[in-house]
Amino acid sequence: TRNHSGIFDVSHMGQLFIYGGDELIKDLEKIFPLDLKNLKLNHSKYSFLMDKDAGIQDDLIITKINEGFLIILNAACKDNDFKILKELLKEKYKMVLDENRSLIAIQGPKSSQILNDVIDGVKDLNFMSGNWFLFDNQKVYITRSGYTGEDGFEISIPNNFADKLTRELIDKGSKLVGLGARDTLRLEAGLCLYGHDLDKDKTPVEANLKWAI
């Protein structure tokens, strides 16, 4: 992953789609410490779901899409996050914690070249931005992001097509990598892990993450 590219199956993470417009933006700004009104379409931000004392319930990535927002949640927290957000938003919006989509990450200095050979145009994405692309006539949402400290991409793809995509990436020279190695990579990069470096007893300020507020 440091020298070439590695593929990680991170489908255990939550993919939460919340559908809505300007009213949704106002409501989410009451929940997340972000300026979502000025977040550009198809751009992403790192943020937190916090309790009333600013304790971190989860850290997450929120992306503005045409339909509303796509929020990537930690696996151990996703069901509780969904419940909390449903209550806070008073069930005003359609919310889907999508179990029908896999999440495949390809990371490393060769990831852009390899993924672009399979899905044309992804190399033009900037860091922390994304868009819808087609793979085998299926809509996939790809962001230029990751959890390794390397250049890379995360691909939200229908479950039935995740295996085919992975095999094509392997055919182009990438290799499968386990989540234990991913944890080592994020440690080397100084990235936080919820449940270890972050928890509900810490605020973002106490966790030295003021830059994300």
Segments predicted by a language model, with ranges:
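Basic, glycine/lysine-rich polyanion-binding surfaces/domains
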Residues: 1-213
